[in-house]
């Protein structure tokens, strides 16, 4: 869990904004949403495989775009 210490003479609203930003960077809310309901191990494997395919397609598209810009 991210923590934020109040600085000297810092408004509470600013500290809340910093806390929200650190939570966003740490991925706390997305993790909570992902763990809200039980996910079967097969569903986990399927989701991870789909993410790997998406990453590889994105990498391939970037390579193709870079290759076409060279000419």
From Swiss-Prot:
Q: Which GO terms describe its cellular component?
A: ribonucleoprotein complex; ribosome
Key words of the record: Ribonucleoprotein, Ribosomal protein
Asked whether the keyword rRNA processing is assigned, the reply is no
Gene Ontology biological-process entries = translation
* Single GO molecular function: structural constituent of ribosome
Looking up InterPro entries in the UniProt record yields: Ribosomal_bS21, Ribosomal_bS21_CS, Ribosomal_bS21_sf
In the record, the note on similarity to other proteins reads: Belongs to the bacterial ribosomal protein bS21 family.
Q: Which HAMAP family match?
A: Ribosomal_bS21
Task: Quote the protein name from its UniProt record.
Answer: Small ribosomal subunit protein bS21
Q: Which organism is it from?
A: Nitrosococcus oceani (strain ATCC 19707 / BCRC 17464 / JCM 30415 / NCIMB 11848 / C-107)
Q: What is the lineage of its organism?
A: Bacteria, Pseudomonadati, Pseudomonadota, Gammaproteobacteria, Chromatiales
């Amino acid at each position: 869990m991210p923590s934020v210490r109040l600085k000297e003479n810092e408004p509470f609203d600013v500290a809340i904004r910093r806390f929200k930003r650190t939570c966003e960077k740490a991925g706390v809310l997305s993790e909570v949403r992902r763990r809200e309901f039980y996910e079967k191990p097969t569903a986990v494997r399927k989701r991870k495989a789909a993410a790997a395919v998406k990453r590889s397609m994105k990498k391939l598209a970037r390579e193709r775009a870079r290759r076409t810009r060279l000419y």
